[in-house]
């Protein structure tokens, strides 16, 4: 089984990724993936996409047809466009209501798997040391702070380890971002040298 040290560290990486990428982006990506699964909504989504293309094509044809010179053709296109548009809006409304309930479910699952799990771990393992410190290695006040609030003296508590992991993940991400920007900047900033004739 994975140790408490790594569980908390991986949890903080997941929380950082969700915060960095953005909850809305993750929700939209999961919604698109859900629509690709063979569910009842798959057919509705396919039909909505088809109707959207049809509405756009009919609108384009209407704009290309003169309403004064070719009124009969324009009126026929207008009726087809209005019918396709009303069908599209009905399907769009159905998908929007489904997306609302899907987003609600995803938000609950995301909260339970990140923040909820973090809170559960803090309460469940509040008296359990994450790891022991060597005896006499640190002065008493430092040991007391590291064991705060309920871990045994001479150990590191879950709450302190949570803070350490959150800070470490943030600092590591900033270092990686800085290095990536520096490498990208140095790759673009290579001056071209002119050859002498």
Curated annotation (Swiss-Prot):
It is found in: Endoplasmic reticulum membrane. Keywords: Coiled coil, Endoplasmic reticulum, Membrane, Transmembrane, Transmembrane helix, Transport. One of its GO terms (biological process) is tail-anchored membrane protein insertion into ER membrane. Pfam families: CHD5 (PF04420). Its main location: endoplasmic reticulum. Residues 1-4, 132-155 are lumenal. The chain crosses the membrane at residues 5-24, 111-131, 156-172. GO terms for molecular function: protein-membrane adaptor activity. Residues 43-99 form a coiled coil. GO terms for cellular component: endoplasmic reticulum membrane; GET complex. It comes from the Eukaryota. It is a multi-pass membrane protein. Residues 25-110, 173-197 are cytoplasmic. Required for the post-translational delivery of tail-anchored (TA) proteins to the endoplasmic reticulum. Acts as a membrane receptor for soluble get3, which recognizes and selectively binds the transmembrane domain of TA proteins in the cytosol. Interacts with get3. Belongs to the WRB/GET1 family. This is Protein get1. The gene is get1.
